[in-house]
Amino acid sequence: GVDVPVVKQGSGPPVLVLHGGDGPLDRLPFAESLSGSFELMHPTHPGFGGTSIPEHFDNLQDLIFLYLDLIDSLDLKGPILMGFSMGGWLAAELAVISAGRFSKLVLVDSVGIKPGGPFDRDVADVFALPAEELLNAAWHDRSQAPDFAKMTDDELQTVAANRVAHGLYTWEPYMHNPKLRYRLHRIDIPTLLVWGENDGI
């Protein structure tokens, strides 16, 4: 098996929160606010937050089956499934395969579905953008963004490792599954799509 660290926060109906390429979200203001009414569970994808990537992992499908096993091991009954960016893609894939496990689905600034043609750039190349441009694209409120200049060497190593893991899971095909859009009809639970108009990614 693969060990997955899970941070629990708050109390109430369970919410499984799947993070994106920046890593776990439990310290952001939205999480503190929601934890007053819900029990948030923040798993860390392998390769993020200083964790290791199993040798046999090479794409997002490995995360899909890892999380199906995790949900079983946590004995979650009808949790709300919430995903951000890459985590939204992962959440959509989980809901397509097994919507009956979840009570509701929330996708925030999700990738995973490519609306344009094969040569349309629907998602910014987050691996090629300079750090400042990436922060400006990803954060409407830069005061909430990470400040790389103030990070320790260990923290910067974690950021670099997060980017490696992010690339492993999302690079080929870039930030989407071309078949996912044709499977979305299988999701038959209440679903909320959240998108920030200033999202530059």
Describe each model-derived feature in a short phrase.
Residues 89-97, 102-135:
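Flexible "cap/lid" loop of the alpha/beta hydrolase fold
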Residues 41-82:
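Active-site loop/oxyanion-hole signature of alpha/beta-hydrolase fold enzymes
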Residues 24, 197-201:
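Acidic catalytic loop of the alpha/beta-hydrolase fold
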Residues 153-182:
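Hydrophobic, aromatic-rich cap/lid helix
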Residues 187, 193-195:
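Short beta-strand/loop motif that positions the catalytic acidic residue
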